[in-house]
């Protein structure tokens, strides 16, 4: 489960940003195309924050839906996989414009 190491990295990023202050809440953005399972991150969060500035912090996850832009006709549409064709023209030259995110969106500290 790579979500454990991802969650450990998120906690490290939060601690650096908190500059020694206690972390009360963390909001993450996780894209549907990122390959990260939000439920697994939630499961790992408590274990990864034990003994850190984020121990006891609340975790909220904002899921970012996948969106693609057709390279042929410029239509922007929802995508669930990297191989979705354009619904307008059927082309497969789609550029992902949203849904790959994995970032700390907000951090609440004391």
From Swiss-Prot:
Explain the purpose of this protein: Involved in the maturation of [NiFe] hydrogenases. Required for nickel insertion into the metal center of the hydrogenase.
Q: Does the keyword Metal-binding apply?
A: yes
Binding annotation for Zn(2+): 70, 73, 86, 89
Q: Name one GO biological process term.
A: protein modification process
Keywords of the record, alphabetical order, are: Metal-binding, Nickel, Zinc
Highest taxon of the lineage: Bacteria
NCBIfam families linked to this entry: hypA
- What family does this chain come from, according to its entry? Belongs to the HypA/HybF family.
The residues listed in the UniProt record as binding Ni(2+), with positions renumbered to this chain, are 2
Task: List the gene name.
Answer: hypA
What's the protein called, per UniProt?
Hydrogenase maturation factor HypA
One GO term in the molecular function aspect is: zinc ion binding
The record's section on Pfam families has: HypA
């Amino acid at each position: 489960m790579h979500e454990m190491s991802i969650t450990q990295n998120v906690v490290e990023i939060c601690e650096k940003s908190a500059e020694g202050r206690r972390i009360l809440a963390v909001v993450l953005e996780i894209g549907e195309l990122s390959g990260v399972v939000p439920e697994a991150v939630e499961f790992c969060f408590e274990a990864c924050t034990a003994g850190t500035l984020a121990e006891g912090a609340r975790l909220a996850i904002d899921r970012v839906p996948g969106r693609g832009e057709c390279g042929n006709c410029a239509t922007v549409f929802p995508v669930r996989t990297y191989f979705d064709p354009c619904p307008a023209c059927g082309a497969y030259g789609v550029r992902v414009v949203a849904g790959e995110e994995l970032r700390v969106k907000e951090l609440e500290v004391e």
